[in-house]
């Protein structure tokens, strides 16, 4: 079993929560193809800057209940940079826990093993849709 931190925005978090589906862009096909039934996904919502500032949050934990499949139906909201993106590589999910209120990710940074550079922590997440994390970090986040 593997543990994954899945990076999304507020709009697509709502889709994940409602439809119980995680999807990634074509360019992340190789990453999602490593995901197996039974793996655990932690949903990380990116921070929002400016006047609508919101810190980064851990929103929920899900178990993967399907193999990776391709579906180009438009359920996720595309990013402004790629308005035609449909996040076609997907897995179906079973909810384990939704955090209400969400967990402030910045408070976890000092304790997380996978973040080796605590000052420039966002570099461990930038440019990724998802990344594998150690079981120890999964337990720290979920046990919070």
From Swiss-Prot:
Q: Which SUPFAM superfamilies match?
A: PUA domain-like
From the UniProt record, list the coiled-coil ranges: none
Matching InterPro entries, A to Z? EVE_domain, PUA-like_sf, UPF0310
Which key words are in the record? Plasmid
Q: Which PANTHER family match?
A: UPF0310 PROTEIN MJECL36
What's this protein's family per the entry?
Belongs to the UPF0310 family.
Q: Where are the transmembrane segments?
A: none
What this protein is called in its record is: UPF0310 protein MJECL36
Q: Which HAMAP family match?
A: UPF0310
Which domain of life does the UniProt lineage start with?
Archaea
């Amino acid at each position: 079993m593997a543990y994954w931190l899945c990076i999304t925005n507020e709009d697509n978090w709502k889709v994940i929560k409602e439809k119980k589906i995680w999807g990634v862009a074509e360019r992340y096909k190789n990453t999602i193809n490593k995901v197996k039934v039974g793996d655990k996904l932690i949903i990380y919502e990116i921070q929002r800057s400016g006047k609508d500032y919101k810190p980064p949050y851990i929103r929920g934990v899900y178990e993967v209940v399907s193999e990776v499949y391709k579906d180009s139906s438009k359920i996720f909201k595309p990013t402004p940079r790629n308005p035609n993106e449909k996040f076609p590589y997907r897995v179906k999910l079973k909810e384990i826990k939704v955090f209400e209120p969400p967990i402030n990710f910045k408070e976890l940074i000092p304790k997380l093993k996978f973040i080796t550079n605590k000052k420039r922590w966002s570099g461990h997440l930038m440019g990724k849709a998802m990344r594998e994390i150690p079981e120890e970090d999964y337990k720290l986040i979920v046990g919070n």
